[in-house]
Amino acid sequence: MAISQAVLATVFGILGNIISFFVCLAPIPTFVRIYKRKSSEGYQSIPYVISLFSAMLWMYYAMIKKDAMMLITINSFAFVVQIVYISLFFFYAPKKEKTLTVKFVLFVDVLGFGAIFVLTYFIIHANKRVQVLGYICMVFALSVFVAPLGIIRKVIKTKSAEFMPFGLSFFLTLSAVMWFFYGLLLKDMNIALPNVLGFIFGVLQMILFLIYKKPGTKVLEPPGIKLQDISEHVVDVVRLSTMVCNSQMRTLVPQDSADMEATIDIDEKIKGDIEKNKDEKEVFLISKN
């Protein structure tokens, strides 16, 4: 018995929901760390503000379209999760970051979404509403999928995949596959097309990870700390280590006669100080007895 397109769309929608559910929960370790340390530790709220906007946009689209329940379920969940993330970040962030977060939320999530809602609901005719909103969602989704280009460029430039978590790339690629088939089976190119690009970039990221992966290397750039700052600290440590090693191993390094005489004088002086301290200690003990 042939399976209908509607049933297949539901199956891929459920699979997409399950995978996207875990992707939404991926930042939990970050916020557990923020909660335990009572500090945002240099993390930024921008990704979560953008994710909140995306969830609002796709929820609105699914409600207008009326036959995309799977989009409503996952984006409703994402909406709640992103609000929790932003709230936790705001609570533990310094004053400057709090102000910046409020500005982003007002500009992107309130004014941005508000403008789209007014345009599509009150200005655009009902017959064109879904089409126009679909184009807006598609353009936004494409811009989000293009975002990893910065990471890809960084991996190629540094020839290191330490900035690119393979697991997240894999699940995002898998999610793109599920939502592509969901959109294709619903004959909705606004859902399907952006996920083609998402799949391509996801596969590219995994290939680059396998090419530039360094076995045993788990060095990651902590949020809020630049590699330049780390390298400066490393240089200082190397200098300090060099000074210690030189002082301990000077007798192994060839020296000219002047240096040797100076070294002997210093050593004799140190020995004399030790003997003097020893004699003073003995005199102190005798006088005490």
Swiss-Prot record:
<keyword id="KW-1003">Cell membrane</keyword>
<comment type="similarity">
    <text>Belongs to the SWEET sugar transporter family.</text>
</comment>
<feature type="transmembrane region" description="Helical; Name=3">
    <location>
        <begin position="71"/>
        <end position="91"/>
    </location>
</feature>
<feature type="transmembrane region" description="Helical; Name=2">
    <location>
        <begin position="44"/>
        <end position="64"/>
    </location>
</feature>
<keyword id="KW-0677">Repeat</keyword>
<dbReference type="GO" id="GO:0048571">
    <property type="term" value="P:long-day photoperiodism"/>
</dbReference>
<dbReference type="GO" id="GO:0015770">
    <property type="term" value="P:sucrose transport"/>
</dbReference>
<dbReference type="InterPro" id="IPR047664">
    <property type="entry name" value="SWEET"/>
</dbReference>
<dbReference type="InterPro" id="IPR004316">
    <property type="entry name" value="SWEET_rpt"/>
</dbReference>
<feature type="transmembrane region" description="Helical; Name=4">
    <location>
        <begin position="104"/>
        <end position="124"/>
    </location>
</feature>
<dbReference type="GO" id="GO:0008515">
    <property type="term" value="F:sucrose transmembrane transporter activity"/>
</dbReference>
<feature type="topological domain" description="Cytoplasmic">
    <location>
        <begin position="27"/>
        <end position="43"/>
    </location>
</feature>
<protein>
    <recommendedName>
        <fullName>Bidirectional sugar transporter SWEET10</fullName>
    </recommendedName>
</protein>
<keyword id="KW-0812">Transmembrane</keyword>
<keyword id="KW-1133">Transmembrane helix</keyword>
<feature type="domain" description="MtN3/slv 2">
    <location>
        <begin position="131"/>
        <end position="214"/>
    </location>
</feature>
<feature type="transmembrane region" description="Helical; Name=1">
    <location>
        <begin position="6"/>
        <end position="26"/>
    </location>
</feature>
<feature type="topological domain" description="Extracellular">
    <location>
        <begin position="187"/>
        <end position="190"/>
    </location>
</feature>
<feature type="transmembrane region" description="Helical; Name=7">
    <location>
        <begin position="191"/>
        <end position="211"/>
    </location>
</feature>
<dbReference type="GO" id="GO:0005886">
    <property type="term" value="C:plasma membrane"/>
</dbReference>
<feature type="topological domain" description="Cytoplasmic">
    <location>
        <begin position="92"/>
        <end position="103"/>
    </location>
</feature>
<feature type="topological domain" description="Extracellular">
    <location>
        <begin position="125"/>
        <end position="131"/>
    </location>
</feature>
<feature type="topological domain" description="Cytoplasmic">
    <location>
        <begin position="153"/>
        <end position="165"/>
    </location>
</feature>
<keyword id="KW-0472">Membrane</keyword>
<keyword id="KW-0762">Sugar transport</keyword>
<feature type="transmembrane region" description="Helical; Name=5">
    <location>
        <begin position="132"/>
        <end position="152"/>
    </location>
</feature>
<feature type="topological domain" description="Cytoplasmic">
    <location>
        <begin position="212"/>
        <end position="289"/>
    </location>
</feature>
<dbReference type="Pfam" id="PF03083">
    <property type="entry name" value="MtN3_slv"/>
</dbReference>
<dbReference type="GO" id="GO:0051119">
    <property type="term" value="F:sugar transmembrane transporter activity"/>
</dbReference>
<feature type="transmembrane region" description="Helical; Name=6">
    <location>
        <begin position="166"/>
        <end position="186"/>
    </location>
</feature>
<keyword id="KW-0813">Transport</keyword>
<comment type="subunit">
    <text>Forms heterooligomers with SWEET8.</text>
</comment>
<comment type="function">
    <text>Mediates both low-affinity uptake and efflux of sugar across the plasma membrane.</text>
</comment>
<feature type="domain" description="MtN3/slv 1">
    <location>
        <begin position="11"/>
        <end position="96"/>
    </location>
</feature>
<feature type="topological domain" description="Extracellular">
    <location>
        <begin position="65"/>
        <end position="70"/>
    </location>
</feature>
<feature type="topological domain" description="Extracellular">
    <location>
        <begin position="1"/>
        <end position="5"/>
    </location>
</feature>
